[in-house]
UniProtKB/Swiss-Prot annotation:
Name of the featured protein: Dual specificity protein phosphatase 10
GO BP annotation list: dephosphorylation; negative regulation of cell migration; negative regulation of epithelial cell migration; negative regulation of epithelial cell proliferation; negative regulation of epithelium regeneration; negative regulation of ERK1 and ERK2 cascade; negative regulation of JNK cascade; negative regulation of oligodendrocyte differentiation
Domain of life per record: Eukaryota
Organism: Homo sapiens
Gene Ontology molecular function, alphabetical: JUN kinase binding; MAP kinase phosphatase activity; MAP kinase tyrosine phosphatase activity; MAP kinase tyrosine/serine/threonine phosphatase activity; mitogen-activated protein kinase p38 binding; phosphatase activity; protein serine/threonine phosphatase activity; protein tyrosine/threonine phosphatase activity
UniProt keyword Nucleus present: yes
A Gene Ontology cellular-component term: cytoplasm
Enzyme class: hydrolase
Designated gene of the protein: DUSP10
Amino acid sequence: MPPSPLDDRVVVALSRPVRPQDLNLCLDSSYLGSANPGSNSHPPVIATTVVSLKAANLTYMPSSSGSARSLNCGCSSASCCTVATYDKDNQAQTQAIAAGTTTTAIGTSTTCPANQMVNNNENTGSLSPSSGVGSPVSGTPKQLASIKIIYPNDLAKKMTKCSKSHLPSQGPVIIDCRPFMEYNKSHIQGAVHINCADKISRRRLQQGKITVLDLISCREGKDSFKRIFSKEIIVYDENTNEPSRVMPSQPLHIVLESLKREGKEPLVLKGGLSSFKQNHENLCDNSLQLQECREVGGGASAASSLLPQPIPTTPDIENAELTPILPFLFLGNEQDAQDLDTMQRLNIGYVINVTTHLPLYHYEKGLFNYKRLPATDSNKQNLRQYFEEAFEFIEEAHQCGKGLLIHCQAGVSRSATIVIAYLMKHTRMTMTDAYKFVKGKRPIISPNLNFMGQLLEFEEDLNNGVTPRILTPKLMGVETVV
């Protein structure tokens, strides 16, 4: 059977099956011409079919390389072009919604000016297999050009006003789009971090599979973002001045596009954090390490007078040695877990491995009691779920008169977080006091901001009695007054 002229058509999603009698088909013979079939330079034009579709919604469908599609709707008509199944995740990519009757011109020849044969009084939009519906794609530079900016001084005034009125909840929601490590080092006070630096998160956010709320890591940030119905939303990165010039692949563009899709009207901080910090550094939060340097005056001599060792500008993580935090509690890295001689010399009989991938070294020898806490050093890892399990294992080692080594990859973030939490549990130390105590013993520690937030939540539960402290017997080796 010869192929139907409708076999070469654009697939659209219609509200109901299209029957042949619903289509206004006309064959324009004016383009048949007197072309010589044997000529190589002028291929013959067989026909041009103009199809007038009366539909309220036209949805661009993914290409054939995308998700599987079916044109079989159960209709007995071979001309039915209803799409029975399609990828719902692509519905939000491009849509053309007409208030009245939408007339679409479809041509089987790209050389045919088919739109000239459509009534000029009707709203016309061209369709092609490559371009889809003739409507602007969400997130184009034209749309981002309409996003307003806010100057650093204006944001500072808003923040100061809310602070003086003691109503911080009425202030704007501030979103930081920079990489997580940069946010960890410094950010505007009260800003929540959106983690869309990885390709998977960016793609899911662009496709509408997740929202900006899903990418906020801390609980306080989520709660604040849920209450933004009447709030301003201010988004910033490192140094953007013109939102219209932001590339579509940049996190700032993706976040703005997602917020616009949710019906929000975000503002962009002109010049980003770099510009804001120049005149308003007092309204920025820095990491605890930077705060400590300021507290001691920033000088190396002052720092060395308060801490056993000065905090280096770039910690020598690779050459860090096994660190005794308490007489029976040691904090180390992967190399320390392999050093059998040192572990036996220090009477270590228990080991906590806070990784998902490092092996349990010397496990087959039966010399140590092991516990693995499968955790990654990421802004999405829930490390607090392992606190009590780790505490019980540490106490078991303590009661048996054995030392315990807790380690992760480098002994910087994951294992350090659990040690800090253990000190908070068994003393009256605040999170900051416990952090500084461990930092004084092992200067390279630097829990990521996600873990610091979990420690703050843990401190709140300890203070409120939700999680009881264990103060007896008193820990030996805690020299500070707590």
